[in-house]
Amino acid sequence: MFNLFLTDTVWYVGQIIFIVAVCLMVTIIVVAFLASIKRCIQLCGLCNTLLLSPSIYLYNRSKQLYKYYNEEVRPPPLEVDDNIIQTL
């Protein structure tokens, strides 16, 4: 009939455990790699949110304030009398 020894059975079980362990390790490594890529993408988005967007906002706002100051707040330049300049 069947001539299965205990050592053969242990060897087969050991092979199955080894294959399952290798598959688990590969799965863990792949998941860790994908998670690190996800973190990198999140950090790039965070960099955009914390650095780039406020800089663009400050640039546009300061440009608006500069135009407003030059057009409405700043007093007109004083006219200089030519006689005063000639006497100097």
UniProtKB/Swiss-Prot annotation:
Location (main, coarse): host cell
InterPro entries xrefs: E_protein_bCoV, E_protein_CoV
GO terms under biological process: disruption of cellular anatomical structure in another organism; viral budding from Golgi membrane
Membrane found in the keyword field: yes
Record's subcellular location: Host Golgi apparatus membrane
Transmembrane stretches, start-end: 17-37
Cellular component, GO annotation: host cell Golgi membrane; membrane
Stretches assigned to the Virion surface side: 1-16
Intravirion membrane side: 38-79
UniProt entry keywords in alphabetical sequence: Apoptosis, Host Golgi apparatus, Host membrane, Membrane, Transmembrane, Transmembrane helix
Recorded topology in the membrane: Single-pass type III membrane protein
Sequence similarity: Belongs to the betacoronaviruses E protein family.
The protein's role, per its UniProt record: Plays a central role in virus morphogenesis and assembly. Acts as a viroporin and self-assembles in host membranes forming pentameric protein-lipid pores that allow ion transport. Also plays a role in the induction of apoptosis.
Subunit architecture: Homopentamer. Interacts with membrane protein M in the budding compartment of the host cell, which is located between endoplasmic reticulum and the Golgi complex. Interacts with Nucleoprotein.
Protein name: Envelope small membrane protein
Organism name: Murine coronavirus (strain JHM)
Gene: E
